Amino acid sequence: MGATKIMVVRHAEKPGSYNGAQYAGVNNLGTVAGDDGAKHLVTLGWERAGALVTLFVAPWGPKTSSLATPQFLFASDPIAKHDDDTSDEGPSQRPYETLTALAAKLSRPIDTSHGKNHYAKMVTSALACDGAVLIAWQHEDIALTTKTGGPGISQEILTQTGTTGKFNIPTSWPSGPAGARYDLVFVFDRPSGDGPITGFTLLAQQLLAGDLP
């Protein structure tokens, strides 16, 4: 048996999220991170990270029957730049930081064994988990197609499960009035834990002021 539900979120808000105004990122100690700030969440992002507990964990959540309390958590490696990572950017702390409050509430570890460009291998690991999985990643790689035109996490989930239908999965990450959205959950269902994906739901988190329905 493998993953029965795979839920994917974009990391929470980063510098530049306040309608273009520049604010430094803040680390988990509440210290403005200086030159390293671009790798961290801003204060609004930390608010969303905390609010994810109410989205996924009793007694407040799961908020809808489409969600489940995750038994396994995945985020891109926040520290190491992997040897075959060709990105000009170093690793980001944001996906990991997005799941820290939830991980603490659930007393579960966050699997960060895969670099941010190694999401195909991450999907393989996630699909092998027995139960509900939550993944936090950079938004450019979550939809069917990445910003460079390659297969994204959603396409990897379909391909690796032998799923032929597309289920109206967005080909690129959805945008709102303020740009690429932070308030969505991609939900892939596979109740048997084996074989193809049987359903897809695009959910609005509706956690913070300004989140869209």
Short names for language-model regions:
Residues 133:
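Mobile, glycine-rich extracellular loop/lid and propeptide segments
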Residues 2-130, 141-213:
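Active-site-proximal alpha-helix that buttresses catalytic centers in soluble enzyme cores
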Residues 136-138:
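Short beta-strand segments
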